[in-house]
């Protein structure tokens, strides 16, 4: 056993092999997300600052799916049969050849645990010079957790299903985090493996065995909020609420205004610049990045979307889109993947835009579908402009050049190009290219004369044009 205060090598194991039957889910418990992050990755993130020599994750149920979400510095170790936490640690020990060191064992269903608490547990273990240390807390509602008794260096943990009525009245609970001296743990694991005589092997049994040889102690959790383990959907919601509040607090401390934290949901991966205002009912998810001085919401849902400085997005949905500096979106717009709005552009009420670039200062103000299109600068699409981009077999592109203007209820049958400065009359159905500077009307559209202001400079036309 290591001497008190010595810094022996640290190894870490996350137990993530269980099914989580109380979740009543087809998905392994540790794969359930909180604020966009799989539960198990919060635990790994708390361990990482301790800089272990190796960080192992024991996988079993849906092993491939769990492996797929693990970060690169986490080493998966397969538990072929889920025979309890004791067997999971035995499997992990087989992957650690070192004889000396400290093994930190953490359950994968505690997403609120902090690196600070893990560091304090480790410090308590090393300074006490004991064989094992377990994290405990006295909880107002200990339902579902093992009860802990400590007596003269021996720690006994009784699972709730095995506890007597008197033991259940004990509110000192095991939180599933341990520090072990490797030699002591290896010996104790062999004893429960050979003598337990039951289907599952409980890691908690090793504490009493180690305590009889070299003492085991407890460390009491200081922040009870971290004791929120996840075993069912209610506990999942409670833990996510706490994480969501932490995320919002962090953004507000960095200069972001959140008008209603109760109705605002921001995932851990989202970035927001200072002096941006987030209005009620807003969801920001995935790789979304919001610049400075933006207004987002109310009732807006953005996923993997970039919003540059000074832009506004209200009552709208964005998926894999980019909103340029000072651009305006909404209300009730839908930006689909591949949409790029350049500086000062606008996509207004009841518009859907997909795989389209909208040039600087161009406007799609209302009631339009624009898909697979390239819109130049200073163009204006009248209400009800539709790009018919799909012929039943292939998607085709529409090009609307700088300064072009479409009247209301215009249909553009792709592939088609509307030339620079061209005008389309209301109700036009365009199935052929329209030359620059011409006015076309009708169904099918035909050129009848020069567009209004065709002989003026483009700047004059831009100043004269009003939004449809």
From Swiss-Prot:
InterPro entries: Bifunctional_GlmU, GlmU-like, GlmU_C_LbH, Hexapep, MobA-like_NTP_Trfase, Nucleotide-diphossugar_trans, Trimer_LpxA-like_sf. Mg(2+) binds at residues 109, 231. It catalyses: alpha-D-glucosamine 1-phosphate + acetyl-CoA = N-acetyl-alpha-D-glucosamine 1-phosphate + CoA + H(+); N-acetyl-alpha-D-glucosamine 1-phosphate + UTP + H(+) = UDP-N-acetyl-alpha-D-glucosamine + diphosphate. The active site is at residue 366. It comes from the Bacteria. UDP-N-acetyl-alpha-D-glucosamine binds at residues 15-18, 29, 79, 84-85, 146, 159, 174, 231, 336, 354, 369, 380. Its EC number is 2.7.7.23, 2.3.1.157. Its cofactor is Mg(2+). Acetyl-CoA binds at residues 383, 389-390, 426. Residues 234-254 are annotated as: Linker. GO terms for cellular component: cytoplasm; membrane. Binds 1 Mg(2+) ion per subunit. Keywords: Acyltransferase, Cell shape, Cell wall biogenesis/degradation, Cytoplasm, Magnesium, Metal-binding, Multifunctional enzyme, Nucleotidyltransferase, Peptidoglycan synthesis, Repeat, Transferase. One of its GO terms (molecular function) is UDP-N-acetylglucosamine diphosphorylase activity. In the N-terminal section; belongs to the N-acetylglucosamine-1-phosphate uridyltransferase family. Homotrimer. PANTHER family: BIFUNCTIONAL PROTEIN GLMU, NUCLEOTIDYL TRANSFERASE. NCBIfam families: glmU. This is Bifunctional protein GlmU. It comes from Rubrobacter xylanophilus (strain DSM 9941 / JCM 11954 / NBRC 16129 / PRD-1). The gene is glmU.
């Amino acid at each position: 056993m290591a001497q008190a205060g010595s810094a022996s090598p640290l190894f870490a194991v996350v137990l993530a092999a269980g099914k989580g039957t109380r979740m009543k889910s087809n998905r392994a418990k540790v794969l359930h997300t909180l604020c966009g992050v799989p539960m198990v990755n919060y635990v790994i993130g708390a361990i990482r600052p301790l800089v272990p020599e190796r960080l192992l994750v024991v996988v079993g149920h849906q092993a491939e799916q769990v492996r797929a979400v693990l970060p690169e510095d986490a080493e998966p170790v397969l538990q072929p049969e889920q025979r309890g936490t004791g067997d999971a640690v035995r499997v992990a020990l087989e992957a650690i050849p070192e004889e000396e060191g400290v093994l930190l064992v953490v359950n994968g269903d505690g997403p609120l645990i902090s690196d600070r608490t893990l560091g304090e547990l480790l410090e308590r273990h090393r300074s006490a010079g004991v064989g094992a240390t377990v994290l405990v807390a006295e909880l107002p509602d200990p339902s579902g957790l093992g009860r802990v008794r400590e007596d003269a260096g021996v720690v006994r943990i009784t699972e709730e299903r095995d506890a007597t009525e008197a033991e259940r009245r004990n509110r000192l609970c095991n939180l599933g985090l341990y520090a072990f001296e490797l030699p002591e743990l290896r010996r104790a694991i062999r004893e429960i493996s050979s003598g337990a005589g039951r289907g599952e092997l409980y890691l908690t049994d090793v504490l009493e065995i180690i305590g009889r040889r070299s003492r085991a102690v407890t460390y009491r959790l200081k922040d009870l909020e971290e004791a929120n383990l996840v075993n069912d959907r209610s506990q999942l919601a409670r833990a996510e609420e706490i994480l969501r509040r932490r995320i919002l607090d962090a953004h507000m401390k960095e200069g972001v205004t959140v008008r209603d934290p109760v109705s605002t949901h921001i995932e851990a991966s989202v970035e927001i610049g200072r002096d941006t205002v987030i209005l009620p009912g807003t969801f920001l998810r995935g790789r979304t990045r919001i610049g400075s001085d933006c207004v987002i919401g109310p009732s807006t849902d953005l996923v993997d979307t970039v919003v540059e400085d000074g832009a506004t997005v209200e009552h709208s949905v964005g998926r894999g889109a980019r909103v340029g500096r000072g651009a305006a979106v909404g209300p009730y717009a839908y930006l689909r993947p591949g949409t790029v709005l350049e500086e000062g552009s606008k996509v207004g009420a009841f518009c859907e835009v997909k795989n389209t670039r909208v040039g600087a200062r161009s406007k799609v103000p209302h009631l339009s579908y624009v898909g697979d299109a390239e819109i130049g600068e200073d163009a204006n699409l009248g209400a009800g402009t539709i790009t018919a981009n799909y012929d039943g077999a292939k998607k085709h592109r529409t090009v609307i050049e700088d300064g072009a203007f479409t009247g209301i209820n215009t249909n553009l049958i792709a592939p088609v190009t509307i030339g620079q400065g061209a005008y389309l009359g209301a109700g036009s159905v365009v199935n052929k290219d329209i030359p620059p500077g011409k006015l076309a009307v009708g169904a099918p559209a035909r050129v009848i004369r020069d567009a209004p202001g065709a002989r003026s400079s483009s700047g004059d036309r831009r100043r004269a044009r009003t939004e449809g």
